[in-house]
């Protein structure tokens, strides 16, 4: 198929070091290599995370892990078993900017590029946008210290969130999810890519 690209790579070996070294002005940053993906997959909200969204959540979480912090990612299952990233918000000073300024606008742009968007008028595109936001899984590479990202997700129509948890204020985000009927999963493992 013309849509498949095969790449040949050398032998893939397991990482030999547990540390990552980054040169910065005036020194070097040494941090542990991020080798795990998640410690758990625990729904912490009243709204249960549907089984049919778990693979999409794992895909979105894996992409989120490899996205520069502070990362917000929205993954979408465009046909059964086939996933794509609709929006990605990397490298911002806070997650709300990653969400509102980068990720959500990219989702809206990409909705217009979906095959089912062809020939739709403005109202049809808006309806498709709402459908996509209702079906994406939103991932965050670290916990939410405030419920603002849950509120922003709800305002867009997002119903599923995956994040590590671990904030002293997790209960505020959980309460907002419960208020809005959003299902949220905690992975127990955060990922920072700086």
Predicted regions and their residues:
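ATP-dependent carboxylate/acyl-activation modules
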Residues: 1-194
